């Protein structure tokens, strides 16, 4: 199933965190925090100004981004857990 976000929303795939700490300790699944880093998989057409003019999104599919810990809504598309969020929930693009 293809999924295309509407307006200024984006679809994000979380990037999995490391299984070990820098010191070599293995982190169990129950102690892991959900990562606040992901890859944009799909982007809506953008927001509209009051005049109706379209504001193009600043992100594109394939961008790696950081977002707030509680940002977005979890959705399942083709058996994969993704996040859908507003572009304004994105804190920045990782270069």
Curated annotation (Swiss-Prot):
Predominant location category: cytoplasm
Span list, region Disordered: 20-45
Swiss-Prot/TrEMBL keywords: Chaperone, Cytoplasm
Disulfide bonds: none
Gene Ontology CC, one term: cytoplasm
Highest rank taxon of the organism: Bacteria
GO MF, one annotated term: protein-folding chaperone binding
Compartmental location: Cytoplasm
Biological process terms in GO annotation: chaperone cofactor-dependent protein refolding
Protein family (similarity comment): Belongs to the GroES chaperonin family.
Functional summary from the UniProt entry: Together with the chaperonin GroEL, plays an essential role in assisting protein folding. The GroEL-GroES system forms a nano-cage that allows encapsulation of the non-native substrate proteins and provides a physical environment optimized to promote and accelerate protein folding. GroES binds to the apical surface of the GroEL ring, thereby capping the opening of the GroEL channel.
Subunit structure: Heptamer of 7 subunits arranged in a ring. Interacts with the chaperonin GroEL.
PANTHER family (alphabetical): 10 KDA HEAT SHOCK PROTEIN, CO-CHAPERONIN GROES
Protein name: Co-chaperonin GroES
Organism: Paracoccus denitrificans
